[in-house]
């Protein structure tokens, strides 16, 4: 009996930890932290490990807060979809009050931690949470334009790192914002495509036309092209201190060609399998792009 009780307690602890990770979307939060760190490394002259730590913690809190508030607001819709019905709130494993406390603590903690870096970083963090929770989340069931609104907080992390490093907003962080802003569309429209039926159950408008049609596929191709084009702008030396060499530009162009290949394939075949491949390709693209940008800067400094 004692062994059974210990096992039950251990299982309960694991469940609580898993629910906490899910309500804050830890994996997504860590990918956002990665973007912020990349932006910081691009903007900084001398790395401050304490600032980097604060940025990572604050960024995690910021994303966790947004996701927790999102799941509170969408709890009645999440229960309708296969992908989300087992989340902590709709499954009944976590109360709304508990989720709200987590969201509130994460919001206050995130903004406070980012403020220790500089006020501008905290301001952009607060703006990100506000837009995601107050505008993007409620608009998802009302208009396809919600993706355009959601692309704003989604594009802030890359830029946020630069602002944390420099306490300044100029053409450099603006360019980083633009790159990740355009990237959001092929990424999220691909998700909206292969999860179309599930999103439909919850009443979400995730595709620009509301349908898996030629017009949506065309827009995916167009925004994929814009993503690649904006990614190459720093090669031409017109974005202030943000610069990459032609060699890095060629690498990004190759990555862009692979990304565009999947977008064009989706335009041709219009199936869920290709949409999922495009989504995975988009994740690889933005991750490798950020690595190339950072590597380019430090290799130039060492040579």
Task: State what each model feature region is.
Residues 2-15, 73-94, 189-216:
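Cytosolic, membrane-interface loops and tails of multi-pass inner-membrane proteins
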Residues 34-75, 83, 107, 111, ...:
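Membrane-embedded alpha-helical segments that form the functional core of polytopic membrane enzymes
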Residues 96-164:
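Intramembrane alpha-helical segments
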Residues 83-121, 212-236:
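Multi-pass membrane catalytic core of lipid/isoprenoid biosynthesis enzymes
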Residues 95, 215, 260-288:
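Interfacial loop-to-transmembrane junctions
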Residues 31-37, 87-90, 149-165, 214-215, ...:
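Small-residue-rich segments of transmembrane alpha-helices in multi-pass membrane proteins
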Residues 61-69, 131-138, 179-196, 228-231, ...:
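Transmembrane alpha-helical segments that form the membrane-embedded catalytic/substrate-channel core
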Residues 291-303:
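Juxtamembrane boundary at the C-terminal end of a transmembrane helix
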